[in-house]
Swiss-Prot record:
UniProt cross-references to PROSITE patterns, sorted A to Z: DYP_PEROXIDASE (PS51404)
Organism: Mycolicibacterium paratuberculosis (strain ATCC BAA-968 / K-10) (Mycobacterium paratuberculosis)
Protein name: Dye-decolorizing peroxidase
Positions of the UniProt region annotated as Disordered: 324-354
Listed SUPFAM superfamilies: Dimeric alpha+beta barrel
First-level EC class: oxidoreductase
Amino acid sequence: MVNIVAVRRHGVHVRVIHVPPVQPQPILAPLTPAAIFLVLTVDDGGEATVHEALQDISGLVRAIGFREPQKRLSAIASIGSDVWDRLFSGPRPAELHRFVELHGPRHTAPATPGDLLFHIRAESLDVCFELADRILKSMAGAVTVVDEVHGFRYFDNRDLLGFVDGTENPDGALAVSSTAIGDEDPDFAGSCYVHVQKYLHDMSAWTALSVTEQENVIGRTKLDDIELDDDVKPADAHIALNVITDDDGTELKIVRHNMPFGELGKSEYGTYFIGYSRTPRVTEQMLRNMFLGDPPGNTDRILDFSTAVTGGLFFSPTVDFLDDPPPLPAPGTPAAPPARNGSLSIGSLKGTTR
């Protein structure tokens, strides 16, 4: 909303127009007990349908959420590299590229298909399901669902390995600066990047460990979620390899909204990793540390029990962009080359084992 205020200056009435900043999607909304993650590919010829449907997302959220506001329904729509130039003319996000597949000495982070990501969450699954259904119906005949995960809160925000997940999330101004693009890409200020991976856990191997051994894998105590002291924390502990700093030693953060999921009949126990960041380079350095090792070969011990089966990188534009997007590209317009070819080019980012 634009606020127009009448003031009197030097005897003259002047209208001062306050134009609000762009509205980001609800990246920083608190965790909820329920979530649905939808990954879609856009079929050939489906671009116009998807382009139109994306403009209706915020209206669908309002319409469904208004019926039961106490359930705090929200949704974040994100777009992948391969489909961006099929959907929008004009500028392209500076760091948008395909997910960087990693092949380490023992473990692999695969890249899997995905053009659109919908992160839908609420206090209960019913409104998530209703919104997901409406979104898919609005894109019927234009998209294919390639992955669908229904996540749930597990006790006090624990994963199915039994540890609290998301403790190190920033909050307040630090959360904003960790996720919102600024002057470095002014065409997309207020937007952010998001990585997703679906991990499946080997619960038989995990439960065979003692609690102390499990704590050494994670780097935290299991019951009360306290980080282990540096002198006892193993170098290959999960949290030790996820500390990323810049050249000045300042720790760089991402915002995780991970959710457990599972299917008992298939003995499937998993964690859906979803990490929002101002630049994809921070999350990519974390993944390099985990899968390739820091130093090389010192890989994340958690990967001996958790296998990544999907991987995607998407761009989460502002609400303003989605409500009024650039037009579709003209027929025959060649796709603009990505600003980066998928190489990590970390530059000033580095991992710090602690």
